[in-house]
Design a protein with these regions (language model features):
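A general structural motif
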Residues: 13-20, 39-45
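Short, Lys/Arg-enriched charge-dense amphipathic segments
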Residues: 12, 85-92, 132-135
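A charged nuclease-like catalytic/ligand-binding cleft shared by nucleic-acid processing domains
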Residues: 16-25, 135
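Extended hydrophobic packing segments that form well-structured cores
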Residues: 56-58, 63, 74, 97, ...
Length: 146
């Protein structure tokens, strides 16, 4: 029987597609190998994006099926996975991947659109969070806190 925690881990690994994992990095560790690197740390929104930024990410793609109105230290593109969420929280969204499920775009078309958005963001286009002035951090507290 699968636990909720193991389901979360499986979903995270599946986001890497068929690419082999080349390295597992410590929290905020810098990648030294080309390819899919996994970063140790919690998977919640603000802590994980803070860790990715500390690890050297310049642009973060954050997929969500619920939506969280936060902004990370690095430009963070919120990729929404369903149309319902986009309808209710459009000002939090950067990219609607739900168009694949609704048939409005093919997977290849949506992938091209997202790739173009990443290039635009890396070139200075503001994300939804940046336009709203959101730039939060959350440091992972591993161990005893006094």
């Amino acid at each position: 029987k699968s636990s909720a925690a193991s389901d979360v881990y499986k979903r995270q690994v599946q986001k890497g597609g068929s690419a082999p994992i080349v390295d597992v990095l410590p929290y905020a560790g810098r990648a030294t190998k080309h390819g899919l690197n996994m970063l140790c740390g919690p998977g919640n929104d603000m802590v994980s994006t803070t860790a990715l930024t500390a690890a050297g990410c310049h642009v973060i793609l954050f997929s969500t099926g619920r939506g969280t109105p936060f902004g990370a230290p690095a430009p963070t593109l919120k990729v929404f996975t369903n149309q319902r969420l986009c309808d209710h929280k459009a000002n939090w969204m950067d990219f609607n991947a739900g168009v694949i499920a609704t048939g409005e775009r093919t997977l290849d078309e949506a992938a091209h659109d997202l790739y173009q958005l990443v290039l635009e963001t890396a070139s200075g286009k503001l994300t939804s969070a940046e336009r709203r002035g959101c730039h939060e951090i959350s440091i992972w507290k591993d161990g005893v806190c006094l």
